[in-house]
């Protein structure tokens, strides 16, 4: 019997190391100051100007080209149809684990992209606002599964994205407070036809979950509304380390606020804080990463692969 030959599957991505990716910056100017960068970085994530220059400037150049190409496509469609409908925002989805640095990535890209002349208005929305309120999670017995797919009001999220993509003049998103760990009642973030909308969160690349009560939920994929998607990746052992470090720092900041949901953790010792944070990671965030977030990495158009020091080691760009 002839032995079957194994033919490795070709990767759908082109992989760049830092030097190769940095060269793609070309002549893109650095339009962010040291002071601005210090305000954009995460609590325990020391972002350097070198990182911005080597990684995020080339990425902003790539996204600018995508936005320009999409704008031309929309204009061609309008010309063909003979109408002059309002502009449609270019939507970028950024996914990744808790504590991996996707929020910092989103803020830096928002700042850099807003400095390009052809799309000065760039808004940023997080998917935290589409979590169910704590009362709903408690009633359903899934409070400890906050961040898992079933904890999101997917219908509201899809309606929001649909309204934005439809070019409505104003679309409102709920606001989530990390201080009180809940949706803020009667508070909204209003999106008014930006040139670019960045949507950042755990679930932006996740496939639909079946819902027998709403056929639309089972048919529509959230990522259908995105023009470009990014996944921020790191090994779980590194993310856990960053999560524990951030948890310890929060004892002196957010946790010390009397209105904080986590104020009971403010007085923990280093050893106690490490134990509590590791337990939360094991039970909730780590499990969610392995079960629901990491499997969506292959759906992204671009992957930022970070090393232990938070610096991006390589970039993978999906082939067209």
Curated annotation (Swiss-Prot):
CDD domains: PanK (cd02025). GO terms for molecular function: ATP binding; pantothenate kinase activity. Keywords: ATP-binding, Coenzyme A biosynthesis, Cytoplasm, Kinase, Nucleotide-binding, Transferase. It is an enzyme of class 2 (transferase). ATP binds at residues 96-103. It is found in: Cytoplasm. Pathway: Cofactor biosynthesis; coenzyme A biosynthesis; CoA from (R)-pantothenate: step 1/5. Transmembrane segments: none annotated. Its EC number is 2.7.1.33. One of its GO terms (biological process) is coenzyme A biosynthetic process. It holds the Pfam family PRK. GO terms for cellular component: cytoplasm. InterPro entries: P-loop_NTPase (IPR027417), PanK (IPR004566), PRK/URK (IPR006083). This is Pantothenate kinase. It comes from Brevibacillus brevis (strain 47 / JCM 6285 / NBRC 100599). The lineage of its organism: Bacteria, Bacillati, Bacillota, Bacilli, Bacillales. The gene is coaA.
